[in-house]
Amino acid sequence: MNRDNMDTTKRKEDHTKHTTDVIEFYEEGTAASSLNIATEKANSSPSILRRIINRAAWLSKKVDAMGVESTGIQRISPYERGTSKKQFLHVAGLWLSATGGLSSMSSFLLGPLLFGLSFRESLASSLISVTIGCLIAAYCSIMGPQSGCRQMVTARYLFGWWFVKLVALASIIGVMGWSVVNSVVGGEMLAAISNDKVPLWVGIVIVTVCSFLVAIFGIKQVIKVETYLSVPVLTAFLLLYISSSDKYSFVNAYVSKGNLDSSTRKGNWMSFFSLCYSITATWGSITADYYILFPEDTPYIQIFCLTFFGTFLPTCFVGILGLLLASVAMSYKPWSVEYDSHGMGGLLWAGFQRWNGFGKFCVVVLVFSLVSNNIINTYSAAFSIQLSSVFCAKIPRWFWSIVCTIICLVCALIGRNHFSTILGNFLPMIGYWISMYFILLFEENLVFRRFFLHLYTKEFPTVTGEINGPELVGSSKEVEKDAVTNIHLLKRKHKVTKHRYNWDKWEDYEVLTHGYAATFAFIVGVAGVVVGMAQAYWIGPIAAKFGEYGGDVAMWLSMAFSGVVYPPCRYLELRKFGR
């Protein structure tokens, strides 16, 4: 018995030593290590190339020394995570700051201003759709603590090693699209309060650069800054409710555009519904990123509720205010002029205008809500880029944050005079892919990881002896019954875990699914998008049945199409390949 204890102690010491080595490796920075290797290989290269590589290696070491997060898409193991209850408060502050800002409000403005809906019509459409979007984002977030992986890394268990790159690309477009919108809005606000002394392009540069300076440092700093920003930002929005209240009598003066027939109004209502759904559902592509430091056994219900209420309450708080301001602008000429001249920034300044200098100060505070939203977008987009190839994964995250910032800045400068067009026509497309991703994840967890776990013979290979960890018996038909028995034992041993994944295999190409079923279901879902979308450049045959401009139902059709196709395809895939 003493010998067994000695063996156990030795294994623990070896495991601890290995863990220490891994942590030290990441603290030194994977980027610097990669560049040092490249330096050795470049000894025979031209001197200019050697100097460039040496300079890059020196820069990488300097950046790591500043405390910049050097880890990329690597999984955070359970023993590397925190256990403090303050994590819940920090993440709650993050959601307050990120979702309770002008990026959320901007879409609500379009109900009256673009779609011609009354305040009541816009309110009903937006609240229902935002609730659905928050439910989807909250469900996606539960993958964070159990996996220790970024959201798009967990998608490898659905789409496989290769096809997940397409999903990562969609995620990049989504979060960077919002960053472009935020940068333009920030520029409009600074131009409005300065009477155009600060040009629009200068304001865009200021917002973009400020976002980058925080996002480059890593998740711990991002969460801290977001928490600190949430208090002044939400206070400023509360003051805007008060300052603009003297004009609320104009809200009901505007009913809806009289030249819209009943069918067209319904179509516009549906399109606005889809737009507001995208505001919160899009968070589903990155929500898990901010729970990877939570303990592995954190109850799912806690993560779900924290994400749902953390996104729902702030979004509704600023969204309803946006509807009030937009409805006033439709019937109150001075505010309408401000919106036509300076866009959303002018409308916000109009709401604060009676407070003069203090009102301008409040507008500047609101700009920080755009910065806080961009911080999250820039931080998470870098991981999706790393997921696109092995080469990109070797390049440090902070470098890709720089690339994302440059792309965002260029796109914002080019599209700065087409804000409503970008927001109304492009961003709803983001909700299409997240709808399909959600339904596939939901079915994978609810059906296959619950009732067909014995078919995952690659992920859970044959072992003998005591069940310890995620390893299960059952890699062939002869031992399938034993596999089912052992799975039941494992579930009783780990009662907290509802969905079974072998997260240690997150980068094992031989174990991860091929992704044939998910990819095929995704493609079928795209067919639903084509027939159901209503945008300026395309109105699908089903969407065209709702009035002159159509009604966007692409999210729901794509979700339905993918959800019907995936189960039979996934079952066949598991039977054929065991993964």
Swiss-Prot record:
<feature type="transmembrane region" description="Helical">
    <location>
        <begin position="520"/>
        <end position="540"/>
    </location>
</feature>
<keyword id="KW-0813">Transport</keyword>
<dbReference type="GO" id="GO:0022857">
    <property type="term" value="F:transmembrane transporter activity"/>
</dbReference>
<feature type="transmembrane region" description="Helical">
    <location>
        <begin position="546"/>
        <end position="566"/>
    </location>
</feature>
<feature type="transmembrane region" description="Helical">
    <location>
        <begin position="395"/>
        <end position="415"/>
    </location>
</feature>
<protein>
    <recommendedName>
        <fullName>Vitamin B6 transporter TPN1</fullName>
    </recommendedName>
</protein>
<feature type="transmembrane region" description="Helical">
    <location>
        <begin position="363"/>
        <end position="383"/>
    </location>
</feature>
<feature type="transmembrane region" description="Helical">
    <location>
        <begin position="222"/>
        <end position="242"/>
    </location>
</feature>
<feature type="transmembrane region" description="Helical">
    <location>
        <begin position="99"/>
        <end position="119"/>
    </location>
</feature>
<feature type="transmembrane region" description="Helical">
    <location>
        <begin position="275"/>
        <end position="295"/>
    </location>
</feature>
<dbReference type="InterPro" id="IPR026030">
    <property type="entry name" value="Pur-cyt_permease_Fcy2/21/22"/>
</dbReference>
<feature type="transmembrane region" description="Helical">
    <location>
        <begin position="158"/>
        <end position="178"/>
    </location>
</feature>
<dbReference type="InterPro" id="IPR001248">
    <property type="entry name" value="Pur-cyt_permease"/>
</dbReference>
<comment type="function">
    <text>Thiamine-regulated, high affinity import carrier of pyridoxine, pyridoxal and pyridoxamine.</text>
</comment>
<feature type="transmembrane region" description="Helical">
    <location>
        <begin position="422"/>
        <end position="442"/>
    </location>
</feature>
<dbReference type="GO" id="GO:0005886">
    <property type="term" value="C:plasma membrane"/>
</dbReference>
<keyword id="KW-0812">Transmembrane</keyword>
<dbReference type="Pfam" id="PF02133">
    <property type="entry name" value="Transp_cyt_pur"/>
</dbReference>
<feature type="transmembrane region" description="Helical">
    <location>
        <begin position="123"/>
        <end position="143"/>
    </location>
</feature>
<feature type="transmembrane region" description="Helical">
    <location>
        <begin position="199"/>
        <end position="219"/>
    </location>
</feature>
<keyword id="KW-1133">Transmembrane helix</keyword>
<dbReference type="InterPro" id="IPR012681">
    <property type="entry name" value="NCS1"/>
</dbReference>
<keyword id="KW-0472">Membrane</keyword>
<comment type="similarity">
    <text>Belongs to the purine-cytosine permease (2.A.39) family.</text>
</comment>
<feature type="transmembrane region" description="Helical">
    <location>
        <begin position="303"/>
        <end position="323"/>
    </location>
</feature>
<dbReference type="GO" id="GO:0000329">
    <property type="term" value="C:fungal-type vacuole membrane"/>
</dbReference>
